[in-house]
Amino acid sequence: MARDKIGLIGSGQIGGTLAHLIGLKELGDVVMFDIADGVPQGKSLDIAQSSPVEGFDARLAGTNSYEALEGAGVCIVTAGVPRKPGMSRDDLLGINLKVMEQVGAGIRKYAPDAFVICITNPLDAMVWALQKASGLPAKKVVGMAGVLDSSRFRYFLADEFNVSVEDVTAFVLGGHGDSMVPLVKYSTVAGIPLPDLVKMGWTSQARIDEIVDRTRNGGAEIVNLLKTGSAFYAPAASAIAMAESFLRDKKRVLPCAAYLNGEFGVYDMYVGVPVVIGAKGVERIVEIELAGRDREAFDRSVAAVQGLVDACKKIAPDLLDR
């Protein structure tokens, strides 16, 4: 049986890590794309040369042409630039919007049936722009944010309680930024909700609040430590979980930036919510009940995303015609 073909658009730190994980998990053959000549070719060759040691038979190739993505069943997009000192939000949006338009056109032409996962920041705005630019069905285009943010939340909770990360479940909703909403009441340890663990004396509400804040600033914490870059191992692993659920029709319930058109009272926006990912893409949006502070926090997060999308519409109004 032919292996699935996975296109990686962007061959930086996340792109390289994605390629290696795809090989290790035998998810399919990999085509790494980048505009920088030699970079995708060199990285794909380096990873391919690890295959005899690791024992995987996935084929890897590097390219500077979108044509090589033809027939890809999954495309994971990391292309774009990070925000640099002195760069305004609109500067970053303007640059990465152009990238999304180019990437969207390439996917539309050569991989129109692909399941597309966007990682480029600012995430919620870029995945919205990518879907508009590609013209792909909204259920086939998602943003990777919630899996990563929830993983960070789970890790911090497991560390706090000194238990296995496997026994911790958690959901982080909303935009991918400091307005994200870690849902304490829907987070559990072996099925026991966090509020109950506070009552049992396992921790205090003050510690939970600190962990929530650390989760919101999880990406910034790593940037501050690295000084010359940002996270790439955990973001790549998070995107792989999404791709694997699609390729293997696992129907996992994962928090992703998904297109909402009425769900949660949100229209024509990508916002982080729980979804079921299977062979058809986003097969269901899990519209959990939000009330009180959680609803207020979610609405604030949606408003922050709306601000980014509105800025995109002003910078690239032609996207609205697609």
From Swiss-Prot:
Matching entries from PANTHER family are given as: L-2-HYDROXYCARBOXYLATE DEHYDROGENASE (NAD(P)(+)), L-LACTATE DEHYDROGENASE
Q: What is this protein called?
A: Malate dehydrogenase
- Where on the tree of life does the source sit, at the highest rank? Bacteria
User: E.C. number, please?
Assistant: 1.1.1.37
Lineage of this protein's species?
Bacteria, Pseudomonadati, Pseudomonadota, Alphaproteobacteria, Hyphomicrobiales
Q: Which CDD domains match?
A: LDH-like_MDH
Q: What Gene Ontology terms describe what this protein does at the molecular function level?
A: L-lactate dehydrogenase activity; L-malate dehydrogenase (NAD+) activity
Q: Which biological process terms from the Gene Ontology are attached to this UniProt entry?
A: lactate metabolic process; tricarboxylic acid cycle
Among its keywords, does the record have Iron-sulfur? no
* Catalytic residues as annotated in Swiss-Prot or TrEMBL: 176
Residues annotated as binding substrate are: 83, 89, 121, 152
**Would I find Oxidoreductase among this entry's keywords?**
yes
Q: Where does the record place a coiled coil?
A: none
Q: Which residues bind NAD(+)?
A: 10-15, 34, 96, 119-121
Question: Into which EC class is this enzyme placed?
Answer: oxidoreductase
Q: Which residues form the signal peptide?
A: none
Q: Which reaction does it catalyse?
A: (S)-malate + NAD(+) = oxaloacetate + NADH + H(+)
Keywords, A to Z?
Answer: NAD, Oxidoreductase, Tricarboxylic acid cycle
Please give one Pfam family short name: Ldh_1_N
| Similarity comment text for this entry | Belongs to the LDH/MDH superfamily. MDH type 3 family.
Tell me the function of this protein: Catalyzes the reversible oxidation of malate to oxaloacetate.
* Classification via SUPFAM superfamilies: LDH C-terminal domain-like, NAD(P)-binding Rossmann-fold domains
